[in-house]
Amino acid sequence: GYFGMSDWSLMDYGCYNNEGYTPIGYSAYEKNFMGWIEYTEPVENTRYTLPVFNSKNADNDVAVKVSSSNRNEYYIIENRARQGWDRYMPAEGMMITHVTYDPQKWESNSVNNYSTQGMTIIPADNNLDNKSYDALAGDLWPYNGNDALTDDSRPAAVLNLGSQRRMGKPITELTLNPDGTASFWYVRGELPKISTPQITSIDHTTNGVTATWSHEPECDVTYSVEVRPHNNLESLLLLA
């Protein structure tokens, strides 16, 4: 059979968590479908921090929707932890769900009956295997050093619809924080390259020295200048 959402959704095998005594909590997609939450639309070059989803505080039910060029295909990112109704999940971390909406499949209740899954997770371990509880342990992000979902990562940020076949919106530095929140960068821009400062002038006086050097106007930079006497036995460190 196909993976679908397996243990990660109440509408799939998640209803049997803890032998059915503690079914998994609602996913971000399910809460959005019911009109209970709205997705956060991300802005490029921004770091997002997500509180724990389903933590009995409506303000914490935050999920980010990464849209493709086709409005019917997108990713959902939410931070899930083993607490509350989620206590018996196979793992904890950021769940990334890949939605490929097809009205006919939704209406006929055949969302995941085909090789092109209408709703399934993107597993951090690149292994859609639900044959055992342990096999699901690597599904959430980050996992075993895998902390980025990009066009070239493994798994890759693939698409099912259109000719593009890649999302083209890197999600990087996926991190679980000590306080239980989870963070990631969305389409992070390149860091500016800082060149080595060049001394442009030095003016010696009886009581000191004045030096000027090239500066990086687009960067917040702190410079250190070490002044040494001729005998090189002592030095004075100045910050500018």
Model-flagged regions — what are they?
Residues 190-220:
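Pro/Thr/Ser/Gly-rich low-complexity, intrinsically disordered linker/stalk tracts
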Residues 1-89, 100-102:
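Extracellular hydrolytic enzyme modules, especially secreted metalloproteases
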Residues 53-191:
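Extracellular low-complexity, Gly/Ser/Thr-rich intrinsically disordered linkers
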Residues 222-240:
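Recognizes extended acidic, P/S/T-rich segments that occur
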Residues 12, 78, 212-214, 226-228:
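Residue-level detector of conserved, well-ordered beta-strand and adjacent loop positions
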Residues 100-102, 217, 229-233:
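Solvent-exposed strand-loop boundary residues in beta-sheet-rich modules
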Residues 183, 210-212, 224:
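Beta-strand secondary-structure signal
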Residues 70-71, 178, 204-207, 218, ...:
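Short strand-connecting beta-turns/loops that link adjacent beta-strands
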